[in-house]
């Protein structure tokens, strides 16, 4: 017991010591100088690299964080790690007001919430639902944090793009740690790298015209609670939110594929045909992944459109794209571990998300919402 407590107290210092450089060690001053010339978007996308993704995930999906269950010590340590990353990138605090619904961390990076959880969202048919319900309990008060990394834009700064991933997972049951390397450690580290790429751009004089909010959320595994709290209590006006790009499970292959050159896109054309077209064009010009839409059909029996954090934005008529690699045999199991992750796959998809966000943030006119449903 004492050894366990010492480990928990010691871990934040270890985590923060690994985040003591303002930017990635892999980016030199010569790199920054070269980035300032030429086609900035693709050059900054290349600062998103396997080595940094792997470094972050080895920490966030380690046993020491005990599965990052919302409300537990491991989730709090993960939140601190993410916040520290934002601070070291030079991202200032953005949350400065408090009311009875939204309490904030003194440094202004946390949006705290306390919500009663009544359900758990399971994304597959064969996961052990009875076990998951027993693990979480029902109708309990959940305390969590969304971590906000706000990168202010220039001439169109009142509008913003929100990039989300959930950093919580299933936690620990008896002696078993559910590391959640793919679900959703993969999306979380992607968000951290996107934040770095945008801040490198800003440092070099190429900051986004629209503001960009990088927001790793918690409470997803409890029923999309963190993102729901944000859309119910937005820090920035929802009417100024151009789009939400949500990243959830991008580090593995599903049973339908034997190569990594694919990603499922869900939701891109549900509210804005223009968002879908931009996404397709960005991929065609820069990345070349196979963009697959089998889970985007309205009659999809899996109903993935309703089952990750983007849906809380879509409910508010904000266009969304959900980036997803599909379900695999280790989903919601203790075997969802770092050594099974394809980091090159994460790198490629993360660059696609960044380049799509770059286009949305820098185009003259915000995308048109032409498919509003009541």
Each PLM stretch: what is its role?
Residues 1-22:
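Bacterial Sec-dependent N-terminal signal peptides
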Residues 18-78, 82-96, 151-153, 370, ...:
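N-terminal hydrophobic or amphipathic helices/low-complexity stretches enriched
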Residues 38-47, 63-73, 132-138, 175-184, ...:
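Second-shell loop/turn segments in exported
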Residues 60, 86, 141-170:
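Acidic/His- and Gly-rich active-site-bordering loop/insert found
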Residues 68-150:
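A non-catalytic alpha/beta surface segment that caps or lines the substrate-entry region
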Residues 147, 163-223, 353:
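Alpha-helical metal-binding/catalytic segments enriched in His/Glu/Asp
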Residues 217-322, 368:
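Metal-dependent peptidase/peptidase-like ectodomains
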Residues 324-374:
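His/Asp/Glu-rich mid-to-C-terminal helical/loop segments that flank catalytic regions of hydrolases
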């Amino acid at each position: 017991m004492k050894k366990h407590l010492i480990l928990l107290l010691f871990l934040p210092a270890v985590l923060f010591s690994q985040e003591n450089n303002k930017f990635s060690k892999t980016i030199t001053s010569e790199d920054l100088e070269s980035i300032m010339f030429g086609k900035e978007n693709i050059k900054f996308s290349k600062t998103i690299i396997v080595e940094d993704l792997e470094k972050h995930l080895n920490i966030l999906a380690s046993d020491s964080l005990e599965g990052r269950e919302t409300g537990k010590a491991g989730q709090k340590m993960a939140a601190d790690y993410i916040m520290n990353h934002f601070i070291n990138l030079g991202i200032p605090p953005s949350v400065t007001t408090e009311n009875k619904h939204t309490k904030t961390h003194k440094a202004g990076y946390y949006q705290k919430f306390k919500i009663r959880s009544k359900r758990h969202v399971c994304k597959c048919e064969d996961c052990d639902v009875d076990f998951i319900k027993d693990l979480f309990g029902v109708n309990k008060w959940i305390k969590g944090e969304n971590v906000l990394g706000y990168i202010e834009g220039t001439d169109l700064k009142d509008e913003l793009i929100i990039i989300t991933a959930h950093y919580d997972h299933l936690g620990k049951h008896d002696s078993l740690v559910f590391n959640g390397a793919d679900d959703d450690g993969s999306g979380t580290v992607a968000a951290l790298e996107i934040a770095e790429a945008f801040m490198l751009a800003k440092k070099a004089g190429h900051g986004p015209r629209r503001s960009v909010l990088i927001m790793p959320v918690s409470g997803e595994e409890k029923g999309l609670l963190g993102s729901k709290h944000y859309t119910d209590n937005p820090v920035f006006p929802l009417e100024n939110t151009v789009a939400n790009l949500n990243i959830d499970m991008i580090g593995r292959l599903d049973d339908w594929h034997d190569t990594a050159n694919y990603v499922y896109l869900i939701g891109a054309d549900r509210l804005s045909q223009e968002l879908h077209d931009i996404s397709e064009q960005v991929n065609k010009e820069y990345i070349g992944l196979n963009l697959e839409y089998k889970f985007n059909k309205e009659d999809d029996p899996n109903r993935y459109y309703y089952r990750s954090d983007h849906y809380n934005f879509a409910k508010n008529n904000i266009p969304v794209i959900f980036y997803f690699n599909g379900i695999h045999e280790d989903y919601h199991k203790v075997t969802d571990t770092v050594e099974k992750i394809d980091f090159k796959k994460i790198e490629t998809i993360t660059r696609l998300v960044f380049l799509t966000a770059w286009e949305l943030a820098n185009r003259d006119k915000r995308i048109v919402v032409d498919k509003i449903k009541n």
